[in-house]
Amino acid sequence: MDSIHGHYHIQLSNYSAGENLQSATLTEGVIGAHRVKVETALSHSNRQKKLSATIKHNQSSRSMLDRKLTSDGKANQRSSFTFSMIMYRMIHFVLSTRVPAVRESVANYGGNINFKFAQTKGAFLHQIIKHSDTASGVCEALCAHWIWSHAQGQSLFDQLYVGGRKGKFQIDTLYSIKQLQIDGCKADVDQDEVTLDWFKKKGISERMIERHCLLRPVDVTGTTESEGPDQLLNAILDTHGIGYGYKKIYLSGQMSAHAIAAYVNEKSGVTFFDPNFGEFHFSDKEKFRKWFTNSFWENSMYHYPLGVGQRFSVLTFDSKEV
């Protein structure tokens, strides 16, 4: 700035007084213009530096993963952007508006909220929206991991979050959830079979009962469109005389599908997990039935045939740990 002003001031000494006055006015304007340009350039440069510093600060101090790579050296899964990601984000937003109503209703029917979780919003949505095969949701994989964790006497959320509190994700668990969903979405594979294979490796097996002199897995299917959730609830709450059981529940409709899970115990009640709303506990089956029928089924919007309110399938599982 000073060197520019000095340069033009020296040139003025070669002119007469009259010319100097005219030139001085012109020069002052030129100097002013240059000063504005320089100040603008410096201001822009400073803004860029501040923005860059802020981004770096946020990336370092607000990283959502406990470390960059999994224990076996794998990075968090990502894929190229697709426009379907925008559509899924909108669907997640609509579902997320139902979270308050569902959670508030739990206490009204004698239940407790064990953990507030929703794949439809917040930091977890930010993680799954990064890959085209997980952007629509990872309910199947979440339910599988929830059953496995519960069967070990542990909490999925202690394994998913550092310290069991929302904040940083433990990348090993996050990666495992996403990868199970990705594997189930591959062409020429059956997602149910992928999950069953994963369960077997974890010591979780389908419950088998004898039918016509043959052992068959307990797989109850039915409809909910006109009958409501009664048949569905009967299948969820039936422990087949054993007194307990893990349930993986599949709901489907005209345009969508969803998985939820439960652990039913004749003595301790029902622990219910929905990836869209969290983990809830009811001390007995009747409280759970009333809540599910009178509140949850509508508040979740699962009763709409256009969504997931047409058909259901309930699989029962046992664990070596139980």
From Swiss-Prot:
Annotated GO MF terms: cysteine-type endopeptidase activity
Annotated coiled-coil segments of the chain: none
Listed GO biological process terms: proteolysis
Disulfide partners: none
EC code: 3.4.22.-
Localisation: Secreted
Any single Gene Ontology cellular-component annotation: extracellular region
Entry function: Cysteine protease, which is translocated into infected cells and plays a central role in pathogenesis by cleaving the C-terminus end of the human small GTPase RhoA/ARHA, a regulator of cytoskeleton. Once cleaved, ARHA loses its lipid modification, and is released from the cell membrane, leading to the subsequent disruption of actin cytoskeleton of the host cell.
Family statement drawn from the similarity comment of this UniProt entry: Belongs to the peptidase C58 family.
Subunit structure: Interacts with human ARHA.
Protein name: Cysteine protease YopT
Organism: Yersinia enterocolitica
Organism ancestry: Bacteria, Pseudomonadati, Pseudomonadota, Gammaproteobacteria, Enterobacterales
Name of the gene encoding the protein in the UniProt record: yopT
